[in-house]
UniProtKB/Swiss-Prot annotation:
PANTHER family: FLAVIN MONOAMINE OXIDASE (PTHR10742), LYSINE-SPECIFIC HISTONE DEMETHYLASE 2 (PTHR10742:SF410). Its cofactor is FAD. It comes from Paenarthrobacter nicotinovorans. Keywords: Flavoprotein, Oxidoreductase, Plasmid. One of its GO terms (molecular function) is oxidoreductase activity. This is 4-methylaminobutanoate oxidase (methylamine-forming). Transmembrane segments: none annotated. It is an enzyme of class 1 (oxidoreductase). The gene is mao. Optimum pH is 9.8. Pathway: Alkaloid degradation; nicotine degradation. FAD binds at residues 31, 33, 39, 379.
């Protein structure tokens, strides 16, 4: 049995820990927060109609989330159809531009890119479109909101994921997405140590890893670093690395996003409306009761949008703009807004990751290649589901598989040395 340290109890870390624990390995999970889940964070919002679950972090479960669905089934959890589509958003602050127009332009962009293999940035692709500037900007807004980075930085490949433009269904976990990490952590029991901030990680010359936290120092056979991108880039942590890994990390972009939740006086219909100017979208969705929750949800993406909104100093302005955008909804004048700005979360340093041009399968593999006995997991390293809950889970499970292979190799070497003796 190996002794394995897992740094971070987000979905990546918990996925790795779960797979290793099921294989009989001895795992210890260090989590700086007082809860599991990381950027998966469910809470309740009081409304005139009662209290309703909201997602302050990761929200939508989409097509292709096979690993997440398997874990949900394993832990007896279910999904709820939101009744609206993550992919289709009606522009609410443009004149003469409809969702159908954006869909058509997005498909034109993908056709233009088909011969080039989606090389370059999304902005370079947008510059080739013959459409009116206002329509191109609406598509640009769609890209920047969803990737949470600038179109001038993110790879044009991002359009393949966000610009499906088909009204595919979207789901959430019944009772809140937080229920999955809660269940996974509960199954691990005392192996999860909360309030433990990692300060240093060091490979030991003759094998093993030294991990220093606020409270003690521990030695492990292997360690899985499942921390957010901004945290692993923190020079103060001084994680083991290589030149190849550092080069690969340069192609990973830190996304910045914020969420807003407002109570509603009446029960609305499902909806999805985007602000092109503000780089945010709003939605109302069905919950586990089968009815539409009286909550307006909003998500703002990209560093420039967050900076312009100045949410820390002027949070009420976003509320006012959302109210002006959604005149179809009954938002109380004294509505108690709940704003979450992930850039201000010191344990996250931002929302999720996106990829810059030049990212390859080999490059993302480098992000997960172990450095000594230190292994890596996180949504930022996932080639297909970057930035998503599914990507975090897949990455964590891959890390667990690599750790088990390493432990088998070490065990085989030890047996061989004993036989020679």
């Amino acid at each position: 049995m190996g002794r394995i340290g897992i740094l971070g109890a987000g979905l990546a870390g918990l996925a790795a820990a779960t797979k290793l624990a099921e294989a009989g390995e001895n795992v210890t999970v260090f989590e700086a927060r007082n809860r599991p889940g990381g950027r998966v964070w469910s809470e309740t919002l009081d409304t005139p109609k009662g209290s309703y679950v909201i997602e302050r972090g990761a929200e939508f479960v989409l097509d292709g989330y096979t690993s997440m669905r398997r874990l949900l089934s394993q832990f007896g959890l279910s999904l709820v159809d939101t009744g609206m589509s993550y992919y289709v958003r009606e522009p609410g602050d443009t004149t003469g531009i409809t969702c159908d127009d954006i869909i058509r332009t997005g498909r034109e962009a993908l056709e233009l890119a088909s011969g080039s293999g989606l090389q370059g940035t999304a902005e370079e692709l947008l510059a080739k479109l013959p459409d009116e500037p206002e329509l191109v900007d609406a598509l640009r807004a769609r890209i920047e909101i969803s990737t949470a980075v600038s179109a001038s930085e993110v790879t044009a490949r991002s359009l393949q994921h966000i610009a499906s433009f088909e009204p595919k269904p979207s789901w959430r976990v019944a009772g809140g997405n937080q229920r999955l990490p809660d269940a996974m952590a509960a199954a691990l029991g005392s192996a999860v140590r909360y309030g433990e901030t990692v300060r240093a990680v060091e490979n030991i010359s003759d094998g093993g890893v030294l991990v220093t936290t606020d409270t003690d120092t521990s030695v492990f056979d292997t360690v899985v670093v499942a921390l957010p991108l901004a945290v692993i880039r923190d020079s103060q942590l001084n994680l083991p690395t290589t030149e190849a890994r550092d080069a690969a990390l340069k192609h990973v972009l830190q996304g910045h996003a914020a969420k807003l939740h407002l109570p509603l006086e009446t029960q609305p219909a499902t909806s999805a409306v985007m602000s092109v100017e503000g780089r945010y979208w709003t939605w109302t969705a069905t919950d586990e009761s089968g009815a539409v929750a009286p909550v307006l949800n909003a998500f703002m993406g990209s560093p420039s949008a967050i900076t312009r909104a100045n949410l820390k100093q002027r949070p009420a302005e976003w509320v006012a703009k959302a109210r002006a955008l959604r005149t179809d909804l009954a938002i109380p004048q004294d509505a108690a807004a709940l704003t979450t700005v992930w850039s201000e979360d010191q344990l996250a340093g931002g929302a999720y990751a996106a990829h810059a041009p030049g990212v390859t399968a080999a490059g993302t593999a480098l992000l997960e290649k172990p450095v000594g006995d230190v292994f890596w997991a996180g949504e930022y390293s996932e080639p297909e589901f970057v930035g998503l809950m599914e990507g975090a889970i897949r990455s964590g499970e891959r890390a667990a598989g690599r750790v088990m292979q390493r432990l088998e190799t070490k065990s085989g070497n030890s047996d061989s040395e004993r036989s020679k003796a």
